[in-house]
């Protein structure tokens, strides 16, 4: 009996979780390069939103500027239908990038850095007071990086009724192209590609479509999917992945109220971002944060050209 117990592997020993990778790195087991590669794929850009500021109007953070998209035949850019347009006229992501850069109201994107294990479906595995250290303001310098940011926000805001296998095939081709342009000089692009890889595969899994890479489906989401579809599961287990009110205790200065407008859909991948206290933290961070993380240089050591 004792031999049988000792032969049973611990779940961390056969998983790709962050804990398992750290254990392998410390023990010296496994291929070190492969471990480092997988560790570098754990952080993601989440709650990606465009930012616009106009005097006299609340700062707008939106994840739904793109109503619909498809991949161009050349697979090097996206064709977008922007939200609020009266017709379904398409615009290429390159042209939209040029328009945004020329618009003084456009302030780039903001996002939150989460690891795969901190993304807990309908809640966040980080204490609310620490979240302000996880937000980043980013202004893409190239059209492809801009398109990758748009794609992140688009995937985050999709729901199960908008599942489209043919679109996922297109997006996989677009991501393959984006990955082919990643170099040591383009660490931010790699980071954005990693995020899109996680989100695309997870969205496919939640939509009951076989993902392109099952090793990069966010772990909490697949567990939650199985728990939700299983009869007789303890409510306590389900509650681990549901929204909590921890953030209500985080006191945001009253002066920030009404200074921001956050617009996101109730998508399959952004259930954790619907809470009012999180919006207050973002607004306070944007208007009153000191030493805010801004740009690629705050995340990576970059090479000087």
Swiss-Prot record:
Pfam families: Herpes_UL7. GO terms for cellular component: host cell Golgi apparatus; viral tegument. Keywords: Host cytoplasm, Host Golgi apparatus, Virion, Virion tegument. The keyword Membrane does not apply. It is found in: Virion; Virion tegument; Host cytoplasm; Host Golgi apparatus. Its main location: virion. HAMAP family: HSV_CEP1. Plays a critical role in cytoplasmic virus egress. Participates in the final step of tegumentation and envelope acquisition within the host cytoplasm. Belongs to the herpesviridae cytoplasmic envelopment protein 1 family. This is Cytoplasmic envelopment protein 1. It comes from Gallid herpesvirus 2 (strain Chicken/Md5/ATCC VR-987) (GaHV-2). The lineage of its organism: Viruses, Duplodnaviria, Heunggongvirae, Peploviricota, Herviviricetes. The gene is MDV019.
């Amino acid at each position: 009996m004792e031999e049988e117990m000792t032969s049973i592997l611990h779940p961390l020993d056969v998983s790709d979780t962050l804990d398992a990778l750290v254990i392998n790195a410390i023990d010296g087991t496994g291929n070190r390069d492969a471990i480092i590669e997988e560790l570098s794929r754990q952080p993601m850009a989440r709650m990606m939103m465009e930012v616009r500021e106009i005097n006299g109007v609340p700062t707008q953070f939106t994840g739904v500027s793109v109503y619909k998209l498809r991949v161009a035949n050349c697979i090097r850019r996206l064709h977008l239908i922007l939200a609020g347009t009266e017709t379904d006229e398409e615009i290429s992501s390159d042209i939209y990038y040029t328009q945004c850069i020329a618009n003084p109201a456009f302030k780039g994107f903001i996002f939150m850095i989460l690891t795969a294990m901190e993304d807990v479906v309908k809640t966040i595995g980080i204490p609310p007071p620490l979240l302000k250290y996880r937000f980043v303001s980013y202004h893409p310098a190239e059209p492809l990086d801009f398109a990758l940011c748009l794609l992140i926000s688009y995937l985050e805001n999709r729901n199960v009724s908008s599942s489209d296998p043919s679109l996922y095939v297109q997006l996989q081709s677009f991501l393959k192209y984006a990955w082919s342009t990643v170099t040591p000089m383009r660490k931010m692009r790699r980071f954005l590609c990693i995020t899109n890889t996680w989100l695309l595969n997870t969205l496919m899994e939640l939509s009951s479509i076989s993902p392109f890479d099952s090793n990069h489906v966010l772990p909490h989401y697949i567990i939650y999917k199985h728990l939700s579809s299983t009869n007789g599961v303890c409510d306590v287990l389900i509650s681990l992945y549901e929204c909590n009110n921890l953030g209500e205790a985080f006191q945001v200065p009253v002066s920030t109220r009404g200074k921001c407008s956050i617009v996101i859909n109730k998508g399959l991948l952004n259930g954790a971002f619907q809470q009012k206290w999180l919006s207050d933290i973002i607004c306070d961070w944007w208007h009153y944060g000191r030493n805010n993380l801004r740009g690629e240089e705050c995340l990576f050591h970059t090479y000087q050209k």
